[in-house]
Amino acid sequence: MRRFFYRHSRGVTEVVVGSGLQYGDYVERPVVLAEEGLRPPIPGAPTLALRGGEEVKSLEVLTKVYGFLKEVGADRSTTLVAVGGGALLDLATFAAGTYMRGIRLVHIPTTLLAMVDAALGGKGAVDWGPVKNLIGVFYQPAAILCDLSWLGTLPERVYRSAFAEVVKYGLALDGDFYSWVRENAKALLARDGGALEYAVYRSLQLKAGVVEVDEFEERGVRQVLNVGHTVGHAVERVLGLLHGEAVAVGMVAELRLSSELGYLRESHVAEAAEVLSSLGLPTSVKATEQQLAEAAALVKFDKKRRGGHIYIPLVVRPGRWILEKIAVEEVEKAVRYVLRQGG
């Protein structure tokens, strides 16, 4: 088992990574939100089962959660325990941050992607109509409990897709960790407990370091977490890839863009593509001409756009990055780097 703490505006969050964690050691007066089908994590605790996926982040479901909390007598001494994937953790964060102006929150992510991404950061949101994450809060959990035993039944494709975020942390923030991931790809795919524990632990350490410096996205430092996501989001929406698969494709496109701008050696682009492939991730995708056009057009609506430019975090060498102002047209070209015409 590994653990660390990070500081933020609300105090300190404890992060624990291991197998067979005893959740009762970390919560008092627990009330649980859990995805349907998961085993009850805390026997005897009031539990509301919810469907997973983006649909859970609605005002209708949020109202249901508020009603549940009121019904079971939740107050400022209650701990809301969120058990599930990233979407449910987002909803729970918003609910905990707004119910009675804030109650204690503990995250128990049950997918690898949620462990290395959504569980840490303090972002909570619900969608409004077709607009994702329109209504949100920053609200840090008191504890994040990454119990690797949840991953045993995770489908292979879903499991592999999370490694795009792990590679991202190494590429952008820690060259030594990037090398470690490259050397341990086989162990990670084999779900080796020791390798997986370190990968999750180090990924969260690196993300926590960013959050400590730029908790509320006011200093630009948190932009590094968007490496691969500018192109990735466009590809994800048009082609229906899993989030991690789209981020992998987006990383290759943005690394190539960095190389064309003279920041990154071409050999680093090729190496990163090999690392992603070794983890079972795509580095390019077949697309029709219409899909190519749709994905290229979508980057124009990126939230980081300012006028005719988009501010994109670019890797300049493993472990180092810069925030660069890129013409929208250049980003559209980057989309075409990784979408092969066909189909």
Swiss-Prot record:
The keyword Cytoplasm applies. It is found in: Cytoplasm. Its cofactor is Co(2+); Zn(2+); NAD(+). GO terms for molecular function: 3-dehydroquinate synthase activity; metal ion binding; nucleotide binding. CDD domains: DHQS. Its EC number is 4.2.3.4. Binds 1 divalent metal cation per subunit. Can use either Co(2+) or Zn(2+). Pathway: Metabolic intermediate biosynthesis; chorismate biosynthesis; chorismate from D-erythrose 4-phosphate and phosphoenolpyruvate: step 2/7. It is an enzyme of class 4 (lyase). It catalyses: 7-phospho-2-dehydro-3-deoxy-D-arabino-heptonate = 3-dehydroquinate + phosphate. It holds the Pfam family DHQ_synthase. It comes from the Archaea. The keyword Lipid metabolism does not apply. Catalyzes the conversion of 3-deoxy-D-arabino-heptulosonate 7-phosphate (DAHP) to dehydroquinate (DHQ). Its main location: cytoplasm. This is 3-dehydroquinate synthase. Zn(2+) binds at E165, H229, H243. Belongs to the sugar phosphate cyclases superfamily. Dehydroquinate synthase family. NAD(+) binds at G86, A87, L88, L89, D90, T110, T111, K123, K132. Keywords: Amino-acid biosynthesis, Aromatic amino acid biosynthesis, Cobalt, Cytoplasm, Lyase, Metal-binding, NAD, Nucleotide-binding, Zinc. GO terms for cellular component: cytoplasm.
